[in-house]
Amino acid sequence: MMSEPGRIPLWLVALVAGTGVLVVVGLFFYGSYVGVGSSL
């Protein structure tokens, strides 16, 4: 997979974006789960 120098590969952008989304969603569900658990 060749790309011109100075350009970020698309797969790297997708990987970082996907990881970021998973982390945000995971933190959201973890935070809501912990909040519900502590409120009970």
Curated annotation (Swiss-Prot):
Pfam families: PsbJ. InterPro entries: PSII_PsbJ, PSII_PsbJ_sf. The chain crosses the membrane at residues 8-28. The keyword Protein transport does not apply. It comes from the Bacteria. Coiled coil: none annotated. It is a single-pass membrane protein. Keywords: Membrane, Photosynthesis, Photosystem II, Reaction center, Thylakoid, Transmembrane, Transmembrane helix. GO terms for cellular component: photosystem II reaction center; plasma membrane-derived thylakoid membrane. It is found in: Cellular thylakoid membrane. One of its GO terms (biological process) is photosynthesis. Its main location: membrane. NCBIfam families: PRK02565.1. One of the components of the core complex of photosystem II (PSII). PSII is a light-driven water:plastoquinone oxidoreductase that uses light energy to abstract electrons from H(2)O, generating O(2) and a proton gradient subsequently used for ATP formation. It consists of a core antenna complex that captures photons, and an electron transfer chain that converts photonic excitation into a charge separation. HAMAP family: PSII_PsbJ (MF_01305). This is Photosystem II reaction center protein J. It comes from Trichodesmium erythraeum (strain IMS101). The gene is psbJ.
